[in-house]
Amino acid sequence: LQERRHDDAEWLVLLLDGKTFAADQMVLALGVTVTGEKRLLGMVQTATENKRVCAAFLREIAERGFVGADGLLVVLDGAKGLHAAVREVFGEDVPIQRCQWHKRENVVSYLPKALQATWRGKLQAAYAHPDYAVAQRALQRLVRELRLLNASAARSLEEGLEETLTLHRLGVFAALGTSFKTTNLIESVMARVEEKTVRVDHWRTSDQKLRWCAAALLAVEKQFRRVRCFRQLPLLQQALRTKMTVESRAAA
């Protein structure tokens, strides 16, 4: 897992997530090819999702051939260390889709329980608009409404809001949102790893944890299927291509 080459495929999406595994943090990388195949790219064992460790991890993956020739979409939650590492390794202009589920749950966590279900529905309805401008206006209305209700919740919604609308801005939310608006693709992998290792309650060494996690990941990978929206992936490829062309012309 940690040594396999990745230059035998054409890559389009990178998903990143950190999960607690046997009291340690495991940061996992999952790639999606232009034809929709999912593949594990690697993992790193760390105490926290800090920028230095995550950047070194991403560079190592890139050195093994993980390159988005037509551009790359990166999907992650709001972890600042991971976010900063992605910008450092893949550039300031790489499009990042922040997980809408994490954003929604972070916002409602500031609200009284009696209001949380209502606000989950409001946020979900706003994000469901496939048009970027319509979704953005709906979310900005919710920001203004939240300022009257709970300033902390409003600030939480505003933080990184544009990155939760990346698929909308690229014009592919209706076609690809089901697969890439959240980090669910990679979180489901870790959930299955936990199922396979839940009975192991004693770890002699840190290396043993890494080996067990890697073995479980490889077992899970054998059951991978293509992403549901694989037939629409050319739309994302073209959108990323267009974005790169516009940016290169602007820089010329």
Task: Label each PLM-derived region with a short phrase.
Residues V34, Q45-C54, R59-G65, F90, ...:
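A detector of single, family-specific signature residues
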Residues F21, T46-N50, V74, I96-C99, ...:
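A generic short alpha-helical patch detector that favors 3-5-residue windows
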Residues A23-D24, H83-A84, S109, L165-T166, ...:
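Short helix/loop capping segments that flank catalytic or ligand/cofactor-binding pockets
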Residues L1-L76, K80, A84-E92, G160, ...:
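RNase H-like nuclease fold core
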Residues L72-K80, A85-Q124:
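Conserved beta-strand -> loop -> alpha-helix junction used to position metal-binding or nucleic-acid-contacting
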Residues A125-A252:
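Acidic/histidine-rich catalytic cores and adjacent linkers
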Residues R39-M43, F66-D70, R104, R120-Y127, ...:
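Short acidic, glycine/Ser/Thr-rich loop/turn "cap" segments at secondary-structure junctions
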